């Protein structure tokens, strides 16, 4: 019996290899044939110069001719897809509904200061890391990454017996030692946990492979149990974080501390997979980084590459629908311009608007209910929404004693129970029972801040919320949602500020202004479906190997592709992987192999020097 099983495994592996090799037979140019990184130029601070790149408003005259593709949405998933295609000689138009390009990478002004919308910190940005290498290739090396302090994260547990602090230090050895100092009786558990994190995270390439292989083949591999048998990553994608931590024998408090980073993906330990959690822990374990001059630099240095290939990135361009030809193939988009609709035709349409917006709103009604479309939507649900608080402070980071460290504040070790109770409460009671706060200090992370905004600082607070608490006002115009809406937002702000002032008493009398945005703000500015911070929920169903294989760049609509976080994972690096998967599908090239080859070439050249 075992011989038959072994032969079957070998046969399947041979088939997988042959199919995989046969997938990439396209003749498209290699976008990563040469290293385009060049010495960084001086930072551009002139507002008009930046506006010409980031705020090019849509007009018919600015639409390039003979387009190869149109991208809906200018978040990193959309911009990176466009940039990669541009490097392959494609002329791409990116359409952004907001007034400024960048999606969650854009910044905005408040009370004379600058705030980020979604980039709080990024891991593995040292020279030589693959994420840094990819970004260097689509920005020509113009992004500069500033390392954050160590500890880069500080978990604070507020309990009946007082406050406990758990620092997360940069460097694997230092990270582990920091945990062991807090839990000396659980050193063996910590060692087993960290080894499992390493093994699982290093198998993430299996998730990428699942999205390349034909779906029937992945279903066959899943049916025979080969995915979970041979891939630690796939196996961990069928286990919840809570399940694994309990199996390791961690105490309730250690379980809470090891799970502290959950706000970066928005799901509690019982409802997300250990594989996703391991990816995030491994991503940051060597330390965290922040883009010098803020997150708008990402879009600012990606857009010129798209433009030089004959493409454009246009704002104030709300896409109303994806156009289909008589055969049901995507052939362009319809853009709202004033009271009129402008049709733009192209052979390929790429949506960075998320699965829900794309399938439920942008497709013609005649195809929204196709079996394959409905099947994909049954695998996902909208993710967690958050309320954002933006605080302007008087004083430098030194005067206010602010570090670049992020603060994760919890009030209970049972995160599942606390969150479930919280989101099920009436909205009037919820502010009294906020289960966690995420508090970053953007101004303390940016080395250029003091030159640009002397003697002032910023602080951001993210509070988990239920979209249902704000849903009754979603049809009301921005700024005209009424007293009850503003009162609810203020109640959350006041509850959060009460906690903040206890944590940072030195800020008393230093607060200049406090503003905030609800999930409706995310929905308005970022076109986030139901205000979801991370798109489709990163729960057990979405991250199961079968769903991972099914949710890919290719859609049931020919010539329509998805990019960004909904086809891989959340965050800058997750959305960037989505862009590589999307571009690989369009170009019919294995861009991961192309990047690997270029990386080897660059390393060899450096050795010669």
Swiss-Prot record:
Gene Ontology molecular function terms on file: all-trans-retinol 13,14-reductase activity
SUPFAM superfamilies the UniProt entry points to: FAD/NAD(P)-binding domain (SSF51905)
One BP annotation, GO: retinol metabolic process
Signal peptide: 1-21
UniProt keywords, alphabetically: Endoplasmic reticulum, FAD, Flavoprotein, Lipid metabolism, Membrane, NAD, NADP, Oxidoreductase, Signal
Tissues showing expression: Highly expressed in liver, kidney and heart.
Reaction catalysis annotation: all-trans-13,14-dihydroretinol + A = all-trans-retinol + AH2
Membrane topology recorded in Swiss-Prot or TrEMBL: Peripheral membrane protein
Gene3D superfamilies reported in the protein's UniProt record: FAD/NAD(P)-binding domain
Cellular compartment(s): Endoplasmic reticulum membrane
GO cellular component: endoplasmic reticulum membrane; nuclear membrane; nuclear outer membrane
Domain of life: Eukaryota
InterPro entries associated with the record: FAD/NAD-bd_sf, Retinol_saturase
Cofactor or coenzyme needed: NAD(+); NADP(+); FAD
Enzyme Commission number(s) from the entry: 1.3.99.23
Protein induction: Down-regulated in mammary adenocarcinomas.
Top-rank EC class of the record's enzyme: oxidoreductase
Family statement: Belongs to the carotenoid/retinoid oxidoreductase family. CrtISO subfamily.
Functional description taken from the UniProt entry: Catalyzes the saturation of all-trans-retinol to all-trans-13,14-dihydroretinol. Does not exhibit any activity toward all-trans-retinoic acid, nor 9-cis, 11-cis or 13-cis-retinol isomers. May play a role in the metabolism of vitamin A. Independently of retinol conversion, may regulate liver metabolism upstream of MLXIPL/ChREBP. May play a role in adipocyte differentiation.
Name by which UniProt lists this protein: All-trans-retinol 13,14-reductase
Naturally occurring in which organism (per UniProt): Rattus norvegicus
Name of encoding gene: Retsat
